[in-house]
């Protein structure tokens, strides 16, 4: 399963910019990988872990702006179609328990 987080946060005031940085750093600390600007994705192994991650994001949501989350299966994620650009694969993103580099 994958959790995809989309967000559009204001960056007008210094407080807005700080909230944006803090939320982005929170996602990265939780293991999310950037797919695009303001679109982050995390691989989770089961529904229990997914529920925990979703509730953690809800607790750390910014004060203002738009934050959306969706959970998709690995099969659905694999069917993603790239219309322009290329898939970046410089990050190891696997559900295998052992990754040999």
UniProtKB/Swiss-Prot annotation:
Q: What does this protein do?
A: CRISPR (clustered regularly interspaced short palindromic repeat), is an adaptive immune system that provides protection against mobile genetic elements (viruses, transposable elements and conjugative plasmids). CRISPR clusters contain sequences complementary to antecedent mobile elements and target invading nucleic acids. CRISPR clusters are transcribed and processed into CRISPR RNA (crRNA). Functions as a ssRNA-specific endoribonuclease. Involved in the integration of spacer DNA into the CRISPR cassette.
Pfam families registered for this protein in UniProt: CRISPR_Cas2
EC top class named in words: hydrolase
Read off the InterPro entries from this record: CRISPR_associated_Cas2, Virulence_VapD/CRISPR_Cas2
User: What protein family is recorded?
Assistant: Belongs to the CRISPR-associated endoribonuclease Cas2 protein family.
Q: Which GO terms describe its molecular function?
A: metal ion binding; RNA endonuclease activity
Co-factor requirement: Mg(2+)
Q: What is its EC number?
A: 3.1.-.-
Subunit structure and binding partners:
Homodimer, forms a heterotetramer with a Cas1 homodimer.
- Stretches that traverse the bilayer: none
Question: A GO BP term, please?
Answer: maintenance of CRISPR repeat elements
Keywords annotated in UniProt: Antiviral defense, Endonuclease, Hydrolase, Magnesium, Metal-binding, Nuclease
The superkingdom listed in its UniProt entry is Bacteria
Annotated Mg(2+) binding sites: 8
Name assigned to this protein: CRISPR-associated endoribonuclease Cas2
């Amino acid at each position: 399963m994958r959790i995809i987080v989309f967000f559009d946060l204001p960056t007008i005031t210094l407080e807005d910019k700080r909230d944006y940085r803090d939320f982005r750093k929170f996602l990265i600390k939780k293991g999310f990988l950037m797919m695009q600007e303001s679109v982050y994705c995390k691989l989770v192994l089961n529904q229990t872990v997914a529920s925990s991650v979703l509730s953690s994001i809800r607790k750390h949501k910014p004060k203002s702006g738009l934050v959306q989350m969706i959970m998709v299966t690995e099969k659905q994620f694999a069917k993603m179609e790239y219309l322009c650009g290329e898939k970046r694969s410089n990050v190891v993103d696997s559900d295998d328990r052992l990754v040999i580099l």
